[in-house]
């Protein structure tokens, strides 16, 4: 299901340069195929805005090569933005009010950079709740990433996330816990997912309100769960959209914070991510940093080019299969009129018919 470059969003050109299939609008118009319209609520901070576009759009684009995708990025006006990001948004992003009028088949909601002790005090809170209230009535399925999952589980069911007291950071092994669900069809029974968070929502409070857990890790906890109707909302605590280098970039950011004094302790390595040789290189880099800091010298160059060939990606293939499953089900269930969430005869409280099948 290739993306259609229906706007001049620079991410389309970046993906084409990577070898991704991105159709021109003229070419797509010649194909007699009902395109799928997917909203993309990007709440990430300015520095990660474009990278987050690429990560999620890449997964959507690789999910299938038959249908067409029109991606509609939008954001919330309450999020603080610099001039450059604001100009990017003004030029390339849709307005939520327009999307409400035009309709969407599916919606992806990114995480965000936490700025307040409590989620309800975050600048995105009211706007996010408004978007989801509309989506629950008008969108076939909504996929929520990390902090968005935490916020919406709290908003919808009053479940507050649990502080871990440390950062769950690295790549962890997971297992499918509900193999009969079509969203995990053809996924490996065990696979890896990156995590990067200080908080967690556990299985027990989710199950108490009817949320079903699909994927879980003995070490990292719940990764994927679905709303009680089993499809209309999909929650993720992990980051299957991450690039191979994403955790390394986070590590680089943290060691820079230590060097400039905004972090007290030197950061640990992300778990299960770096090979021994990569750790040895980074330990040498730490010694260089410590010496430079003692002598009042500039931050030494980070050895990213040396490290890149040593990084493995053990999660991307599974992420592609999941996105294929999710988008395929949206395509099967959505109405031909994208202002309506389902085709005639689909039960909104059990769109997959799975609750009835399983006797839930």
From Swiss-Prot:
It comes from Thiothrix nivea (strain ATCC 35100 / DSM 5205 / JP2). Substrate binds at residues 167, 196, 253. GO terms for cellular component: cytoplasm. Its EC number is 2.3.1.46. Transfers a succinyl group from succinyl-CoA to L-homoserine, forming succinyl-L-homoserine. In vitro, can also use glutaryl-CoA as acyl donor. Its main location: cytoplasm. Signal peptide: none annotated. This is Homoserine O-succinyltransferase. GO terms for biological process: methionine biosynthetic process. Pfam families: HTS. The active site is at 146 (acyl-thioester intermediate), 239 (proton acceptor), 241.
């Amino acid at each position: 299901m290739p993306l259609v470059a229906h706007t001049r969003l620079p991410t389309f050109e970046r993906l084409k340069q990577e070898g991704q299939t991105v159709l021109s609008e003229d070419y797509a118009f010649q194909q007699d195929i009902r395109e799928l319209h997917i909203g993309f609520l990007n709440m990430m901070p300015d520095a990660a805005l474009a990278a987050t576009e690429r990560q999620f759009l890449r997964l959507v684009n690789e999910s299938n090569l038959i249908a067409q995708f029109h991606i509609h990025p939008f954001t919330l006006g309450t999020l603080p933005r610099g001039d450059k990001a604001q100009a990017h948004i003004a030029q390339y992003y849709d307005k939520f009010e327009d999307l409400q009028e035009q309709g969407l088949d599916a919606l992806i909601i990114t995480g965000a950079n936490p700025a307040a002790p409590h989620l309800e005090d975050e600048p995105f809170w009211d706007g996010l709740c408004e978007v989801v209230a509309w989506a629950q009535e008008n969108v076939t399925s909504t996929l929520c990433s990390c902090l968005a999952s935490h916020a919406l589980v709290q908003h919808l069911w009053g479940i507050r996330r649990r502080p871990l007291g440390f950062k769950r950071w690295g790549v962890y092994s997971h297992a499918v816990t509900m193999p009969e669900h079509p969203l995990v069809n053809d996924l490996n029974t065990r696979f890896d997912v990156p995590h990067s968070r200080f908080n967690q929502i556990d299985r027990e409070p989710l199950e108490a309100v009817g949320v079903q857990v699909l994927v879980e890790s003995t070490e990292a906890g719940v990764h994927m769960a679905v709303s009680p109707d089993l499809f209309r909302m999909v929650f993720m605590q992990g980051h299957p959209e991450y690039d191979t280098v994403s955790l390394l970039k986070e590590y680089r950011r943290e060691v820079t914070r230590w060097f400039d004094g905004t972090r007290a302790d030197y950061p640990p390595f992300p778990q299960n991510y770096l090979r021994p040789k990569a750790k040895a290189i980074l330990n040498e880099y730490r010694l260089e940093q410590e010496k430079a800091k003692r002598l009042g010298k500039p931050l030494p160059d980070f050895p990213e080019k040396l490290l890149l060939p040593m990084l493995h990606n053990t999660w991307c293939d599974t992420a592609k299969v999941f996105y294929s499953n999710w988008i395929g089900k949206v395509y099967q269930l959505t109405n031909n009129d994208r202002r309506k969430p389902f085709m005639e005869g689909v039960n909104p409280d059990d769109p997959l018919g799975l609750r009835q099948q399983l006797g839930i």
